[in-house]
C-alpha cells in the first residue's frame, strides 16, 4: 500500500538529498537508566507500538518521480542491546574515576546511537538502542526519522513505551486518524513577509561556507532561579503568553546582535488542530515564520505587543506548508543558508519514559547536526524552564553561543524588572572602551607635523631627492606661496600626480602655514571646480623656485589645519574634512612606531592623493628618515610590472587596499623585500590575508574624520582577525542605536574619539553636530 506524503514528510524527503549522509533528520530521545532494565519488556513494548502505528513501519520510494510512503507488515521492532565498555572498569579504579568513565562511555554511546543514519527507502525508521554499561546502568536511545515522527509524536511514543513496558496488556486509547488536509493559500503570509530579509546576519566566528555541511551541536544553558515565574508574571502583565515574551526577547537579542531591525524567526506548529489528534503519531509539524520589527527603540512592553500581533498572524495561517510560503514570498534558495528563517524558537515539553524501579535521567539527544544557524529550544517540564541551543558549528564557536544566551537571559531579567525600559537600554552591554593595540610605545609626538620631518637626515627622502634638497625646495616653495597670499588657514589646492613634486608641495604648503587640499585629476569637472574655487592658491606644477629667498615663519599651532580632504558622503556632494596638525602628528608618531618604520625603510606611495591614507605613505616616511618611492598609477594596476618596480626600488613597506594586494597576489605574490604589508580602506578577507603571509601583515581601519589609521591589528597566519584595537590615544566605542555600549560579538556602530578627530566638516555647520558628538567621558573608563 502506498500513499502520497504529507507536506512535512515530503519536504524532508527532498532535504535528505542535501544532507549528504548526515543524520540531519534523526529525531532521538536519550535517557540514562539506573536500575534493572528488562530487555524482554522493552522489546515487547516496542513491538506493540510498531503494531499500533503504521507510520513506524513506513518506508519511502518514488513513483513516477513523486515521493510516496509505503506501509510494511507488522513485525518485530528494531531493538538492539549493546555492551558499552568503560575505561575504568577495573577493581582498582576509584569510585569517582569509575563514575567519570561511565559518564564518558554513556555520552559516547548516546552520540553514536543518536547519529546512526536511517535509510528512507529500506527502513526501519524507528529503532531502539540500549547500551549496557553495568547491569544497573544503561543508556536508552529511542530514535526515529523526522519524516515519520515529529516532536509531539515522540512524546506519544515515549509515553506508550513506558505504559506497555510496565503492562503489555494495558489498553491504550485508539491513536485516531491523522489530521486531514492543509491550507494551501499562502496569500496572507505573503503580505506579512513581503520585503523580509533573506538572511539573518549574525556575526560569525568563521566565514559562511558556500554550501552548508549541517554540522551542529546541542548545548544546555543554566536558567537563573525564579526566572520562569518572573517571565510568567510579565506575560500576565502584558496580556501575552510565555512564548510571546520569549519570542520578543529572542527576536530582540537576534536583532541587536546582528544589527538588523527586521527579524524572521520560525516556530513549529504541531499540525494538530485539536485535542482529538493528540495521540496520533506521524510527521505533521510545520515551521511557521514569524516576522518581528524591533526598530524605533520600542519599550519591551511595546515589543511584546508587536510580537503578539505577529504570532496571531502566523498561527492564523499555520497550516500553510512552509515550502509554499518560501515559494510564494520568493525567498532566496541559497545553499549557504536555510531559506527565509535561519533562527528557530521551539517551546515543547521534553519526552519522558517511566520504568518501574528504574531512575530515569534525560540526556541531550545530540545528533551532531543543525538545520539552521541557531535554534533555541525551551523545555517547560519542570519548575524552571530548560534552555537548549542547537548551532551550526561551521559558523559559531561554543563560547559565542554561550555569550548569545547570556545576553538573551540578561535581557529577559531586565525586561521582567522594567518592561517599560527601551530596548537600547535593556540590551546595553558592559563593554566600554576597546583596549589599545599592542605594540612599541611611540615617543611623545611634536605638536605639528613640520616638527617631525627629519630634514637633517642623510640619504634620499623621495625618489632621487635628498633630504637636504627636500628641505631647500620646500622652503623655497613656502616663500613663493606666502607671496601669493597662502598663509595660516589658507587653502592651497594641489593638482599633482604622486611623486617627488607632490612631496615638495605638501611640505612647502605646511612651511607656508597653509592648508594642503589635494585635487583628484579624475574627478568630474564640477567637483574639481568646487574645490579649487574655495582655495586661495591652486598648484598644478612646482614653479621655478628661486635660488635665494627669505624663509618664512609658518605661524601654525597644533590646532592649525594641516589638510582638507573631500569625501563624497551620503549626499554625493563633496564634504570638506579639515584635520589639524596635532591629529596628523600624533597619528604618524603612533602608527610608524607600531610597524617599526625606520631610517632604512623604503615606503611605496601607491594611493591616489585624493585619499587621506596617501599622507601616511608620502609624509610618514619623512618623520623617521625613510625614503618615499612613488609608483605611477599605470604600474599599480599591472601586477607583474608592480612586482618588478617594488623589487627595483627595494621597497620594504607597502600600504594599499586589498584590491591592490590581490593584483600582486594574482601576479605571483608579493616580493620578499616587502617586510611590512598594511591593508587599509577595504575589507581584508581571510583568504587574501593567507596569501600575504610570510611577512608582517597589518589590518587597519580609519575614516577620514579620524585621521587615517584609527585601529590596527597584526594578522597572524591562520588566525581570526578584525579591524583591531585603537591606536594609543584613540578612544574606540561600539555603541547601539541608543548610544549605549554593546557586548562582544554584537553588531554596533564604531564611535571614535581622542587625539585624531577632525575639526569638522568645513562649511557645513550642521554636520559636526550630527556626526561629531561632543561627548565628555560618556561611560566609566571612557
For the regions a language model picked out, list residue spans one by one.
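AMP-dependent adenylate-forming
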Residues: 321, 346, 538-554, 584, ...
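Adenylate-forming
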Residues: 10-19, 28-36, 46-48, 62, ...
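Conserved AMP-binding
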Residues: 496-499, 520, 561, 597, ...
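ATP-dependent adenylate-forming carboxylate-activation enzymes
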Residues: 496-500, 514-530, 626-649, 655-660, ...
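Cytochrome P450 core scaffold surrounding the K-helix E-X-X-R motif
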Residues: 150-156, 352-357, 758-769
Amino acid at each position: 500500500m502506498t500513499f502520497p506524503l504529507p507536506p512535512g514528510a515530503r519536504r524532508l524527503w527532498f532535504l535528505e538529498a542535501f544532507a549528504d549522509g548526515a543524520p540531519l533528520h534523526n529525531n532521538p530521545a536519550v535517557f540514562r537508566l539506573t536500575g534493572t532494565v528488562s530487555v524482554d519488556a522493552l522489546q515487547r513494548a516496542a513491538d506493540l507500538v510498531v503494531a499500533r502505528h503504521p507510520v513506524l513501519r513506513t518506508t519511502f520510494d518514488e513513483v513516477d518521480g513523486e515521493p510516496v510512503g509505503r506501509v510494511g507488515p507488522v513485525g518485530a521492532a528494531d531493538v538492539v542491546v549493546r555492551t558499552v565498555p568503560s575505561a575504568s572498569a577495573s577493581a582498582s579504579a576509584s569510585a569517582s574515576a569509575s563514575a567519570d568513565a561511565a559518564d564518558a562511555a554513556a555520552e559516547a554511546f548516546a552520540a553514536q546511537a543518536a547519529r546512526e543514519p536511517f535509510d528512507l527507502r529500506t527502513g526501519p525508521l524507528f529503532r531502539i538502542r540500549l547500551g549496557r554499561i553495568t547491569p544497573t546502568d544503561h543508556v536508552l536511545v529511542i530514535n526515529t526519522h523526522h519524516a515519520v515522527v515529529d516532536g509531539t509524536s515522540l512524546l506519544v511514543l515515549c509515553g506508550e513505551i513506558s505504559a506497555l513496558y510496565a503492562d503489555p496488556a494495558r489498553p491504550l486509547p485508539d491513536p485516531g486518524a491523522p489530521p486531514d488536509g492543509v491550507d494551501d493559500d499562502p496569500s496572507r503570509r505573503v503580505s506579512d513577509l513581503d520585503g523580509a530579509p533573506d538572511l539573518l546576519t549574525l556575526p560569525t566566528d568563521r566565514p559562511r561556507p558556500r554550501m552548508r555541511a549541517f554540522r551542529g551541536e546541542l548545548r544546555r544553558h543554566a536558567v537563573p532561579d525564579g526566572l520562569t515565574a518572573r517571565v510568567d508574571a510579565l506575560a500576565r502583565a502584558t496580556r501575552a503568553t510565555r512564548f510571546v515574551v520569549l519570542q520578543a526577547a529572542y527576536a530582540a537579542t537576534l536583532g541587536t546582535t546582528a544589527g538588523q531591525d527586521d527579524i524572521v524567526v520560525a516556530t513549529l506548529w504541531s499540525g494538530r488542530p485539536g485535542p482529538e489528534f493528540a495521540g496520533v503519531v506521524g510527521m505533521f509539524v510545520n515551521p511557521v515564520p514569524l516576522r518581528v520589527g524591533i526598530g524605533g527603540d520600542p519599550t519591551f512592553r511595546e515589543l511584546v505587543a508587536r510580537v503578539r500581533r505577529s504570532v496571531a498572524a502566523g498561527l492564523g495561517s499555520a497550516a500553510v506548508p512552509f515550502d509554499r510560503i518560501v515559494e510564494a514570498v520568493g525567498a532566496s534558495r541559497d545553499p549557504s543558508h536555510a531559506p527565509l528563517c535561519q533562527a528557530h524558537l521551539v517551546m515543547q515539553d521534553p519526552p519522558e519514559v517511566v520504568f518501574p524501579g528504574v531512575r530515569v535521567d534525560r540526556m541531550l539527544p545530540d545528533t551532531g547536526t543543525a538545520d539552521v544557524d541557531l535554534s533555541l529550544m525551551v523545555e517547560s517540564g519542570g519548575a524552571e524552564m530548560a534552555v537548549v541551543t542547537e548551532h551550526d558549528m561551521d559558523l559559531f564557536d561554543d563560547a559565542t553561543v554561550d555569550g548569545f544566551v547570556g545576553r538573551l537571559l540578561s535581557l529577559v531579567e531586565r525586561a521582567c524588572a522594567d518592561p517599560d525600559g527601551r530596548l537600547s537600554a535593556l540590551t546595553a552591554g558592559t563593554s566600554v572602551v576597546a583596549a589599545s593595540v599592542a605594540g612599541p610605545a611611540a615617543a611623545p609626538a611634536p605638536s605639528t607635523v613640520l616638527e617631525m620631518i627629519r630634514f637633517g637626515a642623510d640619504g634620499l627622502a623621495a625618489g632621487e631627492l635628498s633630504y637636504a634638497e627636500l628641505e631647500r625646495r620646500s622652503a623655497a616653495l613656502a616663500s613663493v606661496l606666502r607671496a601669493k597670499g597662502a598663509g595660516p588657514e589658507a587653502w592651497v589646492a594641489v593638482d599633482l600626480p604622486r611623486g617627488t613634486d607632490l612631496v615638495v608641495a605638501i611640505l612647502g604648503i605646511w612651511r607656508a602655514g597653509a592648508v594642503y587640499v589635494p585635487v583628484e585629476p579624475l574627478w568630474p569637472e564640477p567637483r574639481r571646480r568646487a574645490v579649487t574655487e574655495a582655495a586661495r592658491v591652486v598648484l598644478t606644477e612646482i614653479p621655478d623656485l628661486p635660488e635665494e629667498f627669505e624663509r618664512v615663519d609658518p605661524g601654525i599651532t597644533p590646532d592649525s589645519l594641516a589638510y582638507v580632504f573631500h569625501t563624497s558622503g551620503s549626499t554625493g556632494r563633496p564634504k570638506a574634512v579639515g584635520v589639524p596638525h596635532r591629529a596628523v602628528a600624533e597619528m604618524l608618531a603612533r602608527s610608524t612606531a607600531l610597524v617599526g618604520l625606520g631610517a632604512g625603510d623604503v615606503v611605496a606611495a601607491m594611493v591616489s592623493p585624493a585619499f587621506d591614507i596617501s599622507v601616511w605613505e608620502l609624509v610618514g616616511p619623512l618623520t623617521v628618515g625613510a625614503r618615499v618611492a612613488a609608483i605611477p598609477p599605470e604600474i599599480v594596476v599591472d601586477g607583474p610590472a608592480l612586482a618588478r618596480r617594488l623589487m627595483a626600488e627595494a621597497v620594504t613597506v607597502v600600504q594599499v587596499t586589498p584590491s591592490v594586494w590581490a593584483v600582486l597576489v594574482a601576479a605571483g605574490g608579493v616580493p620578499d623585500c616587502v617586510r611590512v604589508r598594511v591593508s587599509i580602506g577595504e575589507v581584508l578577507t581571510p583568504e587574501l590575508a593567507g596569501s600575504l603571509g610570510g611577512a608582517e601583515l597589518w589590518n587597519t581601519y580609519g575614516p577620514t574624520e579620524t585621521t587615517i589609521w584609527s585601529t590596527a591589528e597584526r594578522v597572524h597566519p591562520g588566525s581570526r582577525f578584525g579591524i583591531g584595537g585603537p591606536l594609543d590615544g584613540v578612544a574606540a566605542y561600539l555603541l547601539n542605536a541608543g548610544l549605549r555600549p554593546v557586548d562582544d560579538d554584537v553588531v554596533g556602530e564604531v564611535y571614535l574619539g581622542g587625539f585624531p578627530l577632525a575639526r569638522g566638516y568645513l562649511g557645513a555647520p550642521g554636520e559636526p553636530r550630527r556626526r561629531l558628538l561632543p561627548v565628555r567621558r560618556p561611560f566609566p573608563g571612557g
